[in-house]
Swiss-Prot record:
One Pfam family, short name: TAF6_C
UniProt name for this protein: SAGA complex/transcription factor TFIID complex subunit TAF6
CDD domains: HFD_TAF6 (cd22931), TAF6C (cd08050)
InterPro entries in the cross-refs: ARM-type_fold, Histone-fold, TAF6, TAF6_C, TAF6_C_sf, TAF_TATA-bd_Histone-like_dom
Organism: Saccharomyces cerevisiae (strain ATCC 204508 / S288c) (Baker's yeast)
Length: 516
């Protein structure tokens, strides 16, 4: 059996190799050498065509172009052939012409357009292309295209459109050129007239005009059902049974983990604001709303930066509200104590959310923390506030850092003197003053409320201990008379008395006056 390889192509690769060799001045080459070279050439050509067909297939085309062959050569680390025109790029069919040579062979060549050298030479040179660069910009933020130089100008787009199709763009531009379909009183006019006759400027007095409604934010049916289901579950009045609690936790978990809630975020924010302002007496519902806020803040798939300024009023309202949860059921000490615990727990939750927001979004809103500090300071300096407002304000102060707390520390003496009515009070009679419930001028707060406020102030001052150096050696030392005098001048008698009773009084006093 013969093992000689045979070519099955319609052209003769051996003759082609022989012609190329003769053009290079190589004659009398052995036929075996020509066959070996021809088979290698044929393999290389098939390899190039195979790669070119891959590019054609990935480009979703049916016609193999010279550009595919050039890319195949580059993949095979071969310099591509230059000067071959790809007619497919200009939607022009590639055509070949046939010429019969003297030897009886047919030669095909590509029909190309003849170019006049005079016209080609006298044409101006094309502009030098710019170097390719890459940059990033926001194509859209929450579905709204930002007005930056990289994005097309909406006003230019509007002007380029005929007047009768500008309606969808007018709302986005907040323009006064409202598009109105005109119904004329004459029989010749109709709503299918030219665009110029439909513009508002061409509406004559006496004509009936109808203003199109503004473009609404359209939600899918699935999102509407989801929103209504979540809202009804979270606002259900009877949540004592196990099934209702299970549904509530499932809704909160969904808000915390689902990644397709971007379109519903503004609706949830509006719902939160409405529920807080309308239900300040319902502690259970307010607690659920705070859990809802925490779930949205914990969802890593939602971009909440544009909505933080809308969430902060809701959090601060529950933190500083004058009255939460209505009133106690009766005047018994036990009921009043439990009512204070419930309302204070809600304010503690709001303070923890405030701390979470300030730590999670420090770069998005650099003015967020100063604005919160100013709000708390303004509330702190108002001596006509009630216990709940002061408690929430002090809990909010305790989540701030040391430098912010020192702003309040400078006004603490005046605040304590006015709020706790410390006129004529010293360390010698402070304990008797605090225990004298029969004195109506003792303070405007009850003994329990006063103790809670003092403990909250001290918990905020304990944050200042972080400013002390690691090698602080004052732990366990006794407080001197000079330290007591400075403490009372800075914090007032009531707060200073409770600080001096602590085991870490010396360390806390050093933290209060650290750096002075």
């Amino acid at each position: 059996m013969s093992t000689q390889q045979q070519s099955y192509t319609i052209w003769s690769p051996q003759d082609t190799v022989k012609d190329v060799a003769e053009s290079l001045g190589l004659e009398n080459i052995n036929d075996d050498v020509l066959k070996a070279l021809a088979m290698d050439v044929e393999y290389r050509i098939l390899e190039i065509i195979e790669q070119a067909v891959k590019f054609k297939r990935h480009s979703k085309r049916d016609v193999l172009t010279t550009d595919d062959v050039s890319k195949a050569l580059r993949v095979l680390n071969v310099e591509p052939l230059y000067g071959y025109y790809d007619g497919s790029e200009v939607n022009k069919a590639v055509s070949f012409s046939k010429v019969n040579t003297s030897g009886g062979q047919s030669v095909y060549y590509l029909d190309e357009e003849e170019v006049d050298f005079d016209r080609l030479i006298n044409e101006p040179l094309p502009q030098v292309p710019r170097l390719p660069t890459f940059t990033t910009h926001w194509l859209a933020v929450e579905g709204v295209q930002p007005a930056i130089i990289q994005n097309p100008n909406l006003n230019d787009i509007r002007v380029s459109q005929p007047p009768f199709i500008r309606g969808a763009i007018v709302t986005a531009l907040n323009d006064n050129s409202l598009q109105t379909p005109v119904t004329s009183t004459t029989a010749s006019a109709s709503v299918t007239d030219t665009g110029a006759s439909q513009h508002l400027s061409n509406v004559k007095p006496g004509q009936n005009t109808e203003v199109k409604p503004l473009v609404k934010h359209v939600l899918s049916k699935e999102l509407q059902i989801y929103f209504n289901k979540v809202i009804s579950t979270l606002t259900a009045k009877s949540q004592a049974d196990e099934a209702a609690q299970h549904m509530k936790q499932a809704a909160l978990t969904s808000l915390r983990t689902d990644s397709g809630l971007h379109q519903l975020v503004p609706y949830f924010i509006q719902f939160i604001a409405e529920q807080i302002t309308q239900n300040l007496s319902d502690l259970q519902l307010l607690t659920t709303i705070l859990e809802m806020i925490y779930s949205l803040l914990s969802n890593t798939s939602i971009f909440l930066d544009p909505y933080i300024h809308s969430l902060m009023p809701s959090i601060l309202t529950l933190l500083l509200a004058k009255k939460l949860g209505g009133s106690p059921k009766d005047d018994s000490p036990q009921e009043i104590h439990e009512f204070l615990e419930r309302t204070n727990a809600l304010r503690d939750f709001a303070a923890s959310l405030l701390d979470y927001v300030l730590k999670k979004f420090p770069q998005a809103y650099k003015s967020l923390k100063p604005r919160v500090t100013r709000t708390l300071l303004k509330t702190f300096l108002d001596i006509n506030r009630v216990f709940g407002t002061y408690y929430g304000c002090l809990k909010g102060v305790s989540v701030l850092e040391g430098e912010s707390i020192r702003f309040f520390l400078g006004n603490l003496n005046n605040w304590a003197r006015l709020v706790f009515n410390e006129s004529g009070i010293t360390l010698d009679n402070i304990e008797e003053h605090l225990n004298d419930d029969s004195n109506p001028t003792r303070t405007k707060f009850t003994k329990e409320e006063t103790q809670i406020l003092v403990d909250t102030v001290i918990s905020a001052l304990l944050v200042l201990k972080k400013d002390l150096p690691d090698l602080y050696e004052g732990k366990g030392e006794k407080v001197t008379d000079e330290d007591k005098e400075k403490l009372l001048e800075r914090c007032g008698v009531t707060i200073g008395f409770h600080i001096l009773k602590r085991d870490d009084a010396k360390e806390l006093i050093s933290a209060i006056f650290f750096g002075e």
